[in-house]
Amino acid sequence: MKKLKINYLFIGILALLLAVALWPSIPWFGKADNRIAAIQARGELRVSTIHTPLTYNEINGKPFGLDYELAKQFADYLGVKLKVTVRQNISQLFDDLDNGNADLLAAGLVYNSERVKNYQPGPTYYSVSQQLVYKVSQYRPRTLGNLTAEQLTVAPGHVVVNDLQTLKDTKFPELSWKVDDKKGSAELMEDVIEGKLDYTIADSVAISLFQRVHPELAVALDITDEQPVTWFSPLDGDNTLSAALLDFFNEMNEDGTLARIEEKYLGHGDDFDYVDTRTFLRAVDAVLPQLKPLFEKYAEEIDWRLLAAIAYQESHWDAQATSPTGVRGMMMLTKNTAQSLGITDRTDAEQSISGGVRYLQDMMSKVPESVPENERIWFALAAYNMGYAHMLDARALTAKTKGNPDSWADVKQCLPLLSQKPYYSKLTYGYARGHEAYAYVENIRKYQISLVGYLQEKEKQATEAAMQLAQDYPAVSPTELGKEKFPFLSFLSQSSSNYLTHSPSLLFSRKGSEEKQN
């Protein structure tokens, strides 16, 4: 996956550039058949999407997601409300454009030559590759050549179907596959790890998120190179919507909003470690149940799952952990820090967790107010790891290298430079193991993604079991057995003042279609 960026891949680029050149004179309000004028007269922007971990989802009725957030800001930019329609699969999305039921498709859709024959693409904002996945314990194919429809299934409307057909026509005549009209890519990946399906194909970002919860899913091979992701609108000769999108994305790029959204939803990294993730999830089952009450008790302003992720990064949830540098306990506190916090026994799990939270809150309070509220936690964690003074040096170095010292995406790139003499020799507080602070924060984010997604999967399984029990014993009301609410990725949906993580975790796909007004 590549970084978020503006990429002007428009099939009708001459017409689009003309629309941009004439931007000030476009009669948005005066022409009845002008697309922007119609949207503003209607008072709402109609966007169709699908439920995925990255694009759109809800917690307690509150929507979130990369594409949702961008669409909401675009609606605000146009001065209208956002109306979201959730569809089951990609084919239904394009049906909405064909039938005039949507102004835009915002669903992490890949730009390709077939789609742009019939639909207008917008600016591209990140990229993915398509990959064949399998279960770790099963046979790993090294080529597509011998795969059959009994082995390979893909989701309806998936962009890879065109690529598979090209490969069949030019290279692998024996290749065949099946399209499951009822399932999306996430459900098909679940089928793979459950042994119901040998192989499927999904995009690299979706796979990366899925692996944080299901490390037994592995990539067999790449099917495509990196492909840009974009939005689509009707291709009807009216360029006003395309021009507005271009201007909007340019503005978002220039003021740093795109970079912040990239860091929020895509900043978890894509360097998956199977052994580490599997070990962590085993600890979630074996160790976390005893520690969960303590994390919930002392979490206060942060999500308890974030606190649990911090503690795992520090000590692997070992209250007796000791470092050669002298730090000890669940939260690996120094002797001086422990004394300043009134901790008498660093190896006492409760004292250590309580003290660690107070120390983190102290770091949070020192982060400059100019840092966006939803990014302050990352600055605080870097300070927690290497010291507040060195975090200030990292911000200063970021500014010197023409970055934004208030943007975590920029500052974290400068952290490794704190251990390089040409840089630290010119800084106020000198040498620091900035590369360790970088890895520290990134690991915590990955652990929380895994933890929240894994706990959610267990909640889902428990709810499904309860519903099945109700069907087996109909005298028990299914709604009574399944009514307990469970945390659909609440670490992303709650207000930024809770200092929760900003990388999305895996959500199971929702079926059917829904409409939401925002």
Curated annotation (Swiss-Prot):
Enzyme class: lyase
Disulphide-bridged cysteine pairs: none
Active-site annotation: E314
InterPro entries in UniProt: Lysozyme-like_dom_sf (IPR023346), MltF (IPR023703), Solute-binding_3/MltF_N (IPR001638), Transglyc_AS (IPR000189), Transglycosylase_SLT_dom_1 (IPR008258)
Membrane topology value: Peripheral membrane protein
Annotated PROSITE patterns: TRANSGLYCOSYLASE
Signal sequence residues: 1-21
Cellular localization per UniProt: Cell outer membrane
Main localization of the protein described in the UniProt heading: membrane
Gene Ontology MF annotations: peptidoglycan lytic transglycosylase activity
Keyword Lyase appears in the UniProt entry: yes
Entry annotated with the keyword Lipid metabolism: no
Keywords assigned by UniProt, alphabetized: Cell outer membrane, Cell wall biogenesis/degradation, Lyase, Membrane, Signal
Coiled coil start-end: none
Pfam families: SBP_bac_3, SLT
Known function: Murein-degrading enzyme that degrades murein glycan strands and insoluble, high-molecular weight murein sacculi, with the concomitant formation of a 1,6-anhydromuramoyl product. Lytic transglycosylases (LTs) play an integral role in the metabolism of the peptidoglycan (PG) sacculus. Their lytic action creates space within the PG sacculus to allow for its expansion as well as for the insertion of various structures such as secretion systems and flagella.
Protein name per the record: Membrane-bound lytic murein transglycosylase F
